[in-house]
């Protein structure tokens, strides 16, 4: 036997290795040699897509596998209905079985056969000592009939998941997860149940990362969200639908990624000076997150903040050292106003959008004359992405940063069009004519 | 501030001094420290020096604190470089990570081998790992038929 070291591993370790594979790859090893024929059967993992099975007999395969391993524990069950099949309500049954066998990772992606029909998960997903990660996509979850108990659950990902009518369902689930660290909630657009979960409260002492997506689809003001998580380090806030937004106890917040208009379209109708309620909501939100160190902010969020900043000044983000922002042509002045709130900014990454659908009500400023504090004292690195040289906005920005940044060490330009490969020398020549306030500043061009 | 050091002894008699905080990423070593039997050093009968060096390298990198602040992204890149090894070394690492009970190293090494299997045909897998096919053609055909779907 000339076999390389892999054959010296004992069966138990070989099955461990196979458990890191999708089941289809694990099954293929059955023909490698006699030793491998039945190893795959002992892997405590099912990781399948419906599309793996050309004749759709995935159900009998799963049944047989679970029957064969009746006495052993299951570590992971992952099933994706990535193709249309005759929906036969088998998923819930398999979830019941695997949860009963001490499952640690449950990942189910359902298929929406038609509007208003979903497969609902069984109650036993709410009571499991071993579950560490739960990922559910395009399925439904019922109102918990008992106290939720998921003492090991660290990761929860609920995407396009339907609920029944219990307004406290999310709170009940979260309070049953004392070690939950990572939560992703992508709320569905459920036209059949528009008034479900109007008030979302996420309150957790253990949560470290939370991503919320709630895309605007209904013109109304009755949705609201509250986030209370003192250990939260990362927040991704992409909720455009909630009208009332409360964020509190963000004492550990280090990074925020925000893309929201705060439902200003309908809840605040253009943020008239008279709309005190919305002004207060935005002010409290910004104050709550003002300790962040790293921020990613979208164009529409900046626009809302710009309108808002005319009523009340934006709070200072004293700890913000790194900012990524998307801006468009008409927003350059707005950007500078925002930068004034970041007195210790070291690192700035800008993405320039040329498409500009907003009509600027202010006269186009020809020169950017205002210089925020951070350019004078802390800003060391500026990166401009999707830049088109020769285009006015990009050039304006490059000139501006070179002329006004006192301590700038690096200016990185990521060019949009790769066709300019041989024009590098021309660009460099032109750039070298721009006034540079920071002598040691290095300009780097990347295609 | 001096940190507590312990001595690890490989199967081929070499000694390695390591910070206790770094070494107890191994649950096996952590238990020994708790049971207080480390005074004369910890003999690791199943791990030879060549492998122990790699294990210590891994544990040092993964001991993240103020002195070694490293992002997850950077760790992932480092993992890739770290695992650029000969097959035999990778299998020895699996055995060592299993024996020393270092979960993250065990996951990494197993995943690396799994990635060498994933997406390949049985012939390619046999070739990668030098596995001899001891099925007769009829036997192999019968096994394939059992799970036809996987081979299509």
From Swiss-Prot, chain B:
GO terms for cellular component: nucleus; SCF ubiquitin ligase complex. InterPro entries: SKP1, SKP1-like, SKP1-like_dim_sf, SKP1/BTB/POZ_sf, Skp1_comp_dimer, Skp1_comp_POZ. It comes from the Eukaryota. Involved in ubiquitination and subsequent proteasomal degradation of target proteins. Together with CUL1, RBX1 and a F-box protein, it forms a SCF E3 ubiquitin ligase complex. The functional specificity of this complex depends on the type of F-box protein. In the SCF complex, it serves as an adapter that links the F-box protein to CUL1. Plays a role during early flowers reproductive development. The keyword NADP does not apply. Residues 94-152 are annotated as: Interaction with the F-box domain of F-box proteins. Transmembrane segments: none annotated. Keywords: Nucleus, Ubl conjugation pathway. Expressed in young seedlings, roots, leaves, floral stems, inflorescences, and siliques, with a slightly higher level in inflorescence than in other tissues. Pathway: Protein modification; protein ubiquitination. SUPFAM superfamilies: POZ domain, Skp1 dimerisation domain-like. Its main location: nucleus. This is SKP1-like protein 12. Part of a SCF (SKP1-cullin-F-box) protein ligase complex. Interacts with ADO3/FKF1, COI1/FBL2, EBF1/FBL6, PP2B10, At3g61590 and At5g49610. SMART domains: Skp1. It is found in: Nucleus. Pfam families: Skp1, Skp1_POZ. Signal peptide: none annotated. One of its GO terms (biological process) is protein ubiquitination. Belongs to the SKP1 family. The gene is ASK12. CDD domains: BTB_POZ_SKP1.
